[in-house]
Amino acid sequence: MSNTEITGDSRMIETNQPDMHEKLVEIVHKHIAHPSQKPIQAHTQQAFDEINHIVQAFSGEVILDSCCGVGQSTRLLAKQNPDALVIGIDKSAHRINRNVDEVEHDDGQGRVENYHLIRADLNDFYRLVVTANWQISQHYILYPNPWPKAKHVQRRWHGSAVFPQIIAVGQEIILRSNWRLYLEEFQLAASIFSLQGDISAINDAQPLTPFEAKYQASGQQCWQLRIFK
């Protein structure tokens, strides 16, 4: 992280949904029975084709950092796993193109180079990853948009049409959120695929993302769900 002080001005999640969504299980089963037939967007197909050549040629551990934002988490994961290939995906070109250098120069030992930041729509990208049979060791989804209104449950990853593909990616899936209910719902949805996970409080000294830093500075508890296969 840089020396810039993180101010605690993040608001708590506001929701009209006090417990897990009553239709979540039904929604997940619907998406299992009726897989998405939406055409793959051209820019995502092109981005996937380019990184797929690198992944297929790599013989080591591959880590996927979904919804990577400005890429801080991707760089940190790459630094923590120097022998791995770390791939960060985000739909926003603006976020991807921001030159964040917290990791590259903080130890005086040069740049971290074992990662790639890719602009792509994850709704399409996940489907391509599954079709190409990428062997992902760890799949991170850090602080996804919570969509806290009950009517928006299908905009949450576990309520989306691509959830069957999401849950297929990675030997270990790691989610973080400041809304514990989001993780509890994801955990329930994963159980439909006979996958188990555990939720724990995060007390890391070094936040993985700018959102995590802001939430912690605001006094909010952040949570992590780990799903093992």
Give residue ranges: language-model regions.
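Conserved beta-strand/loop positions that form the S-adenosyl-L-methionine
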Residues: 66, 89
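S-adenosyl-L-methionine
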Residues: 2-62, 72-80, 103-132
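Conserved beta-strand signature within the Rossmann-like core of class I S-adenosyl-L-methionine
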Residues: 170-177
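Conserved SAM-binding loop
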Residues: 99
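Class I S-adenosyl-L-methionine
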Residues: 182-189, 193-229
